[in-house]
Amino acid sequence: MNNLRNRLSGVNGKNKRVKEKEQKIWSEIGMIAGAFALLDVIIRGIMFEFPFKEWAASLVFLFIIILYYCIRAAASGMLMPRIDTKEELQKRVKQQRIESIAVAFAVVVLTMYDRGIPHTFFAWLKMILLFIVCGGVLFLLRYVIVKLAYRRAVKEEIKKKSSFLFGKRGKRSQFRAAFFIGTLICIHSAKLF
């Protein structure tokens, strides 16, 4: 990806300001391409009701852009704010559960709008199954993202505490310091008994 960016870029220097401008330009190009794909889906797919094959590529392109953005935003921590405590984790999981149920309900309503209201028991069963599967998969995916964000925050907190205690030494010196502290504690506790 960096090779492609360097080939398409006029400036290969390491100036941070130039790189930020270049990233802004690329993001604007991506937004314009996504807007054209969305416009194509709306005009050909919804307004003129052309066959699905004619506007499916635009829909796929739009989903790829959205998926790429979500993955990059989740990986950078931009999509989910920092979760430091268990209470925040529980609150965020509850929020994700409610949002997943709402999205699953919207999918079922849109499906019923497209296909019509079910008239048989098995058709209703399919709608209920669609609701459960869609909500479950979406909640599972969002739960994993929230849990990973919480674990990342906990790991960073542990790193900060350990670097505060032991400084920026290597693993061997950290082991020596921990061994020394443990020895002092053992000697002190032996004196108490």
Curated annotation (Swiss-Prot):
Q: Which InterPro entries match?
A: DUF6773
Protein name in UniProt: Uncharacterized protein YcgB
Q: Which organism is it from?
A: Bacillus subtilis (strain 168)
